[in-house]
C-alpha cells in the first residue's frame, strides 16, 4: 500500500553532522509534526538493476559503487545496501538491487579516478555521492554535480514544500549558476563527461575547475567546503576560493593548458569527442576578473583585471577573436592590422616607439632601425642588401639587423664579376677597386 512520505531533520545526517532543528513551517496539504514535511508517496523497489557511470574523471576499474537504502519517512540509512564494482574504463557499473523499502537511495562511489588535469590516475581515492529517486529510473550516473547538489537538495526538502525532483532541479541550477553557467541540461544523474552536449561540457568544466592543481586530499576538502557553503542559501560565498580557481584557470588558459587537458582526455581513447568545456572554464575566470564576454563589438578592447584579490590583479587583457588574452605591447599595437607587404615596417598603434616588420605572412617585433632608417625591415630575404638610410648613411642588412656598411660594401653592392685585372671606381666614394678573381 502506498503511504505518504515524511522527511525529518535527521535526513541531513546522511551526509553531514546534524545541527539544531529549525522552526517548522507550514506545508500545503495539512499540518505536520515538528521538523517534518510532507513528500510524495513511497514506492518499493524490487529486483532492479541500477547501472551508470561514476566519474570525476572516470573511476578506474575495481572502484566500488554502493546503492544504500534510505528509510521512506526519514531518509535515514537503514543499513541495507547492495554493492558493485567499476567494470569498464569509462567508469561503468551495474548493481543488482533485490529490495528497497522506498524509491529513495544514496549511491556512493569510492576509488581511484583518472585526473583530466594531469592525465594520470589519482594517487589517492575519493568518494562521490548521488541522491536519487529510483521510482522511474534505473540509470544513475555518479559525478561531481550529483555530489555537490545532494546536501543542498536535502536542505530544500526539509525547509520547503518541494518534491524530490524539484529540490534536486533547484540545487543543480544553483550549482551551475555559481560557476556562471546557465542552461537546461536535464538531470545531473544523466550527465556524462564523455557526452557531446552543453551539459557534458558544463560537467567537465566544473570538474576541471574544482580539481585545478589540487591533490586528492585538498580536492576532497574543497568539495566538502563548497557543499557546506551552499547548503542553506544556494549561494557560493567563498570569494577566496573562487579567486584561487579563477587564477588557476586564467594561467592555464593563457599558457595553452586547456588544450593539454583536452589532449589528456583524448589520449585516454574513451570517447570519439571531448565536449567544449573550455568555454565554461574561460567564462568563469573572465567573470571573476570582471572582464565580461569578449564580443565582436569589443574586439581590440583592453581591460585590466577587476579582481583586486587576484594574483594577476595588475594584468591587462585584450579582447581578440572572441577570447580575452594577455594584453602585451605586441597585441595592443598590432591587433587591428591587416597583412602587409613582405619586409614592410611600421610603428605600433599603442606604443608608438615599438617597431614591427611583416615577414613570412606575419607581423613580428623588430629593431627600431627597421622603422627609423626608412629602409623597411631587415628580413631573411634582404640579407646582404645595402641601402641609404634616412640619416644619409649607408647600411647593410646582416642577421636581421641594419648595420653601418663598410666603404667597400656600399661602393660595390650589386656589382657582377668582371675580367681579371679590371679597374672600377666605387659607386659611392672615389675609391678604385681591382677585380682579382672570384671569391
For the regions a language model picked out, list residue spans one by one.
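Fold-core signature of tandem repeat domains
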Residues: 294, 303, 317-319, 324, ...
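Feature for extracytoplasmic/surface-facing segments of secreted or surface-associated proteins
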Residues: 18-299, 304-315, 320-334, 338-341, ...
Amino acid at each position: 500500500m502506498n503511504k505518504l512520505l515524511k522527511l525529518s531533520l535527521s535526513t541531513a545526517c546522511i551526509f553531514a553532522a546534524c545541527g539544531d532543528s529549525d522552526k517548522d513551517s507550514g506545508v500545503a496539504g495539512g499540518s505536520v509534526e515538528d521538523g517534518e514535511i510532507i513528500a510524495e508517496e513511497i514506492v518499493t523497489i524490487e529486483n532492479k538493476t541500477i547501472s551508470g557511470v561514476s566519474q570525476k574523471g572516470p573511476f578506474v576499474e575495481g572502484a566500488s559503487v554502493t546503492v544504500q537504502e534510505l528509510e521512506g519517512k526519514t531518509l535515514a540509512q537503514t543499513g541495507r545496501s547492495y554493492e558493485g564494482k567499476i567494470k569498464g574504463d569509462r567508469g561503468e557499473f551495474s548493481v543488482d538491487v533485490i529490495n528497497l523499502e522506498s524509491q529513495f537511495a544514496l549511491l556512493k562511489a569510492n576509488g581511484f579516478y583518472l585526473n583530466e588535469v594531469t592525465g594520470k590516475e589519482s594517487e589517492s581515492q575519493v568518494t562521490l555521492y548521488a541522491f536519487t529517486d529510483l521510482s522511474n529510473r534505473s540509470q544513475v550516473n555518479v559525478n561531481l554535480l550529483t555530489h555537490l547538489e545532494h546536501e543542498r537538495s536535502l536542505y530544500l526538502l526539509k525547509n520547503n514544500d518541494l518534491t524530490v525532483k524539484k529540490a534536486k532541479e533547484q540545487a543543480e541550477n544553483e550549482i551551475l549558476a555559481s560557476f556562471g553557467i546557465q542552461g537546461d541540461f536535464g538531470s545531473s544523474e544523466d550527465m556524462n563527461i564523455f557526452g557531446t552536449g552543453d551539459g557534458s561540457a558544463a560537467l567537465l568544466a566544473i570538474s576541471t575547475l574544482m580539481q585545478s592543481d589540487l591533490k586528492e586530499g585538498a580536492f576532497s576538502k574543497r568539495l566538502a567546503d563548497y557543499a557546506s557553503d551552499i547548503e542553506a542559501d544556494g549561494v557560493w560565498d567563498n570569494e577566496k576560493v573562487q579567486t584561487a580557481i579563477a587564477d588557476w584557470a586564467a594561467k592555464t588558459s593563457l599558457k595553452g593548458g586547456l588544450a593539454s587537458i583536452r589532449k589528456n582526455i583524448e589520449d585516454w581513447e574513451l570517447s570519439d569527442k571531448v565536449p567544449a568545456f573550455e568555454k565554461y572554464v574561460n567564462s568563469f575566470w573572465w567573470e571573476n576578473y570582471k572582464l565580461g564576454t569578449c564580443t565582436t563589438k569589443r574586439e581590440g578592447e583592453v581591460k585590466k583585471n577587476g579582481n583586486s584579490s587576484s594574483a594577476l590583479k595588475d594584468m591587462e587583457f585584450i579582447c581578440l577573436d572572441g577570447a580575452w588574452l594577455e594584453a602585451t605591447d605586441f597585441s595592443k599595437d598590432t591587433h587591428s592590422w591587416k597583412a602587409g607587404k613582405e619586409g614592410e615596417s611600421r610603428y605600433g598603434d599603442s606604443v608608438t616607439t615599438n617597431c614591427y616588420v611583416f615577414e613570412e605572412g606575419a607581423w613580428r617585433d623588430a629593431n627600431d632601425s627597421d622603422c627609423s632608417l626608412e629602409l623597411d625591415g631587415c628580413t631573411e630575404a634582404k640579407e646582404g642588401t645595402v641601402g641609404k638610410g634616412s640619416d644619409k648613411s649607408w647600411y647593410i642588412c646582416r642577421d636581421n639587423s641594419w648595420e653601418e656598411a663598410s666603404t667597400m660594401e656600399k661602393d660595390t653592392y650589386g656589382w657582377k664579376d668582371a675580367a681579371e685585372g679590371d679597374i672600377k671606381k666605387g659607386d659611392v666614394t672615389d675609391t678604385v677597386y681591382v677585380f682579382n678573381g672570384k671569391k
